[in-house]
C-alpha cells in the first residue's frame, strides 16, 4: 500500500503531473512554443522557431514529470531515480551509496526512510559534472533524518547543468518513507549514507527507482 503524500500541491499543466519548482523553467518555454505555433502560418520566422521551441517544451515536460509511486515496504528505499555509481565504505563505519541521475531520469528525490528531518543545509560549491569525483565539492544540500535506524544522511549534489536544488520540506518536518523531499534540476547525484551494520542490497551499475528500489538487505 502506498504511503499518503501530504506535501503542498505540485505545479500542473494540461493534466500532466509536474515537479514542484518547475514553473520558472517550464512556463516560459511552453509559452514560447505556443505563441510560435499560433503564428507559424503567418510568419516564416515563427514557423522556424516553432519546431525547436515545441521540442524543447516537450523535453521540459518530460524532465519535470513527477509520477506517483507505490512505495516499497522495506527499511531503506532509494531516494533517487538513476544508476548506482559507487558503493564505498566510510571511515566512520557507514556505507555511501552514490546514485547518478541523468537528464532523462525523474529528478524528484524521496525520503529513504520515515522519520524527522533534523537538518537541511545548503552548501555552496562548484558545478563539475556529477559523475566526476571532484563533484563532491559541488553545490549541495545536506539532509539528516532521525529514523528507526538512527541518523541517516542524504546529500543532493548539483551537476554541471543542475545549478538549482529545491528542498520541499524544512527542518523539523516528519516525513513518511518515499515522501517527496526535494528536486534537483538537470542532471545530478544523490549520496545516501547507511549506518554501520546495514548491508547494501544494490550493486554498481544497477538502475534505481526512487521510493521503489530496496537499498538494504534484511
Curated annotation (Swiss-Prot):
Main subcellular location: membrane
Role this protein plays: Catalyzes the formation of phosphatidylethanolamine (PtdEtn) from phosphatidylserine (PtdSer).
GO BP, sorted A to Z: phosphatidylethanolamine biosynthetic process
Pathway as given in its UniProt record: Phospholipid metabolism; phosphatidylethanolamine biosynthesis; phosphatidylethanolamine from CDP-diacylglycerol: step 2/2
GO molecular function: phosphatidylserine decarboxylase activity
Record's bilayer topology term: Peripheral membrane protein
Subunit structure: Heterodimer of a large membrane-associated beta subunit and a small pyruvoyl-containing alpha subunit.
UniProt site (Cleavage (non-hydrolytic)): 187-188
Secretion signal, residue range per the UniProt entry: none
PANTHER family named among the record's database cross-references: ARCHAETIDYLSERINE DECARBOXYLASE PROENZYME-RELATED
PTM entry text: Is synthesized initially as an inactive proenzyme. Formation of the active enzyme involves a self-maturation process in which the active site pyruvoyl group is generated from an internal serine residue via an autocatalytic post-translational modification. Two non-identical subunits are generated from the proenzyme in this reaction, and the pyruvate is formed at the N-terminus of the alpha chain, which is derived from the carboxyl end of the proenzyme.
Subcellular location: Cell membrane
Positions annotated as active site in the UniProt record: 188 (schiff-base intermediate with substrate)
Keyword Lipid biosynthesis in annotation: yes
Protein name per UniProt: Phosphatidylserine decarboxylase proenzyme
GO cellular component: a single term: plasma membrane
Source organism of this protein record: Streptomyces coelicolor (strain ATCC BAA-471 / A3(2) / M145)
Cofactor detail note: Binds 1 pyruvoyl group covalently per subunit.
Top-level taxon of origin: Bacteria
The reaction(s) this protein catalyses: a 1,2-diacyl-sn-glycero-3-phospho-L-serine + H(+) = a 1,2-diacyl-sn-glycero-3-phosphoethanolamine + CO2
Cofactor section: pyruvate
Record keywords: Cell membrane, Decarboxylase, Lipid biosynthesis, Lipid metabolism, Lyase, Membrane, Phospholipid biosynthesis, Phospholipid metabolism, Pyruvate, Zymogen
InterPro entries cross-referenced by the UniProt entry: PS_Dcarbxylase, PSD-A
Residues recorded with modification Pyruvic acid (Ser): 188
Record family assignment: Belongs to the phosphatidylserine decarboxylase family. PSD-A subfamily.
